[in-house]
Swiss-Prot record:
Pathway: Amino-acid biosynthesis; L-lysine biosynthesis via DAP pathway; LL-2,6-diaminopimelate from (S)-tetrahydrodipicolinate (acetylase route): step 1/3. Keywords: Acyltransferase, Amino-acid biosynthesis, Diaminopimelate biosynthesis, Lysine biosynthesis, Repeat, Transferase. It comes from the Bacteria. It catalyses: (S)-2,3,4,5-tetrahydrodipicolinate + acetyl-CoA + H2O = L-2-acetamido-6-oxoheptanedioate + CoA. GO terms for biological process: diaminopimelate biosynthetic process; lysine biosynthetic process via diaminopimelate. Its EC number is 2.3.1.89. It comes from Streptococcus uberis (strain ATCC BAA-854 / 0140J). This is 2,3,4,5-tetrahydropyridine-2,6-dicarboxylate N-acetyltransferase. It is an enzyme of class 2 (transferase). Belongs to the transferase hexapeptide repeat family. DapH subfamily. One of its GO terms (molecular function) is tetrahydrodipicolinate N-acetyltransferase activity. Transmembrane segments: none annotated. Catalyzes the transfer of an acetyl group from acetyl-CoA to tetrahydrodipicolinate.
Length: 232
């Protein structure tokens, strides 16, 4: 499935124009006296749809009026991504919003949060609990470590998003600030806070992050990715 990457203005328009929904699943007993609208899916004694369409049906329940409501949002503008046809490994518990681009053989681990407009290149791994803000971009064959944050930018629309290059390793709990670009082949050490652009093939560390060395054979060996983890 191909998703066209959106500009900031397109994302803002998408959110602003979207019908805000409170999606619910309702399990009920008794009989519904009112007709079920087309916007509501009824499977046996379970209803799926927007709360504002389902609530009136429950008011008119006949006989047994018990019901249970399950919900996970309120007036949400952006649905979660339909992952069924994405050629990537996405583990349970990852939260990925609509209009996210995910390349072939990428890996999204449990607890990762990926906001609207983000782009993840082929073969890239987003580790547990990592956060990719709106419009953040990661190239191919990179690794975003557990708990790392790539800050998002949707407003102001003129601001530049985070851009991570190809073959980059961002260590656990590192933070890359809005607008920063990290060049191909570079390494961001665990816990670093990156406030300025990082050139290609260097290691940065510290708060704020500074270049501590150029990539050498020893660093490449320590940061090599495992292709077996990306097999589908």
């Amino acid at each position: 499935m191909t998703v066209q990457k959106m500009t900031a203005q397109e994302i803002i328009a998408f959110i602003g124009n979207a019908e805000k929904k409170t999606s619910v699943k309702v399990t009920f007993e008794g009989e519904l006296s009112a007709p079920v609208p087309e916007s509501v899916l009824k499977l046996g004694n379970v209803l799926f749809g927007d709360w504002k369409a389902i609530e009136p049906l429950l008011v008119d329940l006949k006989e047994n009026v018990d019901f249970i409501v399950e919900q996970d949002g309120r007036n949400s503008a952006v649905p979660l991504l339909d992952k069924r046809r994405i050629n990537a490994r996405i583990e349970p518990g990852a939260i990925i919003r609509d209009q996210v681009v995910i390349g072939d053989n990428a890996v999204i681990m449990m607890g990762a949060i990926i906001n609207i407009g983000a782009e993840i290149g082929p073969g890239t791994m987003i580790d547990m609990g990592a956060i990719l803000g709106g419009r953040a971009t990661v190239g191919k064959n990179s690794h975003i470590g557990a708990g790392a944050v790539l800050a998002g930018v949707i407003e102001p629309a003129s601001a530049e998003p985070v851009r991570i290059g190809d073959n980059v390793l961002v260590g656990a709990n590192a933070v890359v600030i809005e607008g920063v670009q990290v060049g191909n082949g570079s390494v961001v050490a665990a816990g670093a806070i990156v406030t300025e652009d990082v050139p290609e093939n260097v290691v940065v560390a510290g708060v704020p992050a500074r270049i501590i060395k150029e990539i050498d054979s020893q660093t490449q060996q320590k940061t090599a990715l495992e292709d077996a983890l990306r097999l589908i």
